[in-house]
Regions:
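Core structural elements
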Residues: 1-2, 20-33, 49-61, 79-100, ...
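Acidic, turn-prone loop/beta-hairpin segments
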Residues: 38-66, 94-184, 199
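Long hydrophobic segments that form regular secondary structure
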Residues: 59, 73, 81, 185-190, ...
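Conserved, well-structured core segments
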Residues: 82-85, 178-181, 187, 203
């Protein structure tokens, strides 16, 4: 955040980094739209711990972004939105969702629940990001919004997200954090022994 009489050096590396962020968000939206094309119909839903985890983490991200705006710390607002989008939604939740959507053992209720959380989380994330990157979020939202049940003509006509304390789930966060630690540990062991990702190993 630049103040008066303070100059910031233009950093092309940061520009490239945010270009990569835009690409990451675009690809995430494509994955969500492709994964939710097949309608599971109305009915009961079952949420996995990972579905509950991302809903819980989204509330924390919303609170952090809103606090950044309230304090006129637009840098902190952008950082909170960036970190949730990249490190939690894209890097982890999208991968977790594949274990439900691509498994023959998953029930219709499980797939229905994961698909709904995918769409609702992305739609909320787009509204959260909109003040920071209005054009791209509007473009994606025009396709995602209707699937999430939104009827406004523009993302600008929809309310800005507010954190919902009822969706904070400490148990899901604890379980998912342990799962992430195990996965990272296995990846580290693979790297230490030069085991290719394609090689299946007993755990």
């Amino acid at each position: 955040l630049a103040t008066q009489s303070r100059d910031l050096r233009f950093d092309l590396g940061r520009v490239e980094g945010y270009r990569n962020f835009c690409n990451k968000l675009w690809n995430a939206a494509r994955f969500v739209m492709m994964s939710t094309e097949q309608d599971e119909g109305a009915g009961e839903e079952t949420l996995s711990p990972y579905d509950r985890w991302i809903r819980s983490r989204l509330q924390a991200a919303i609170a952090a972004v809103r606090q950044g705006f309230a304090d006129y710390r637009f840098d902190l607002a952008a950082q909170a939105a960036y970190e949730f989008t990249w490190y939690e939604f894209c890097d982890w939740y999208l991968e977790f969702s594949k274990t439900v959507l691509q498994s023959e053992a998953s029930s219709t209720e499980q797939r229905r629940g994961t698909k709904r959380v995918l769409v609702e989380s992305l739609e909320t994330l787009l509204r959260l990001l909109h003040p920071l990157m209005p054009y791209m979020t509007e473009e994606i939202w025009q396709r995602v919004g209707p699937r999430a049940g939104r009827t406004a003509a523009s993302i600008m006509r929809e309310p800005y997200p507010t954190a919902d304390a009822s969706r904070v789930d400490a148990d899901a966060e604890s379980l998912t954090n342990r799962a992430r630690d195990v996965i990272l540990g296995i990846r580290g062991i693979r790297g230490s022994f030069d085991i290719a990702p394609s090689v299946r190993i007993p755990i």
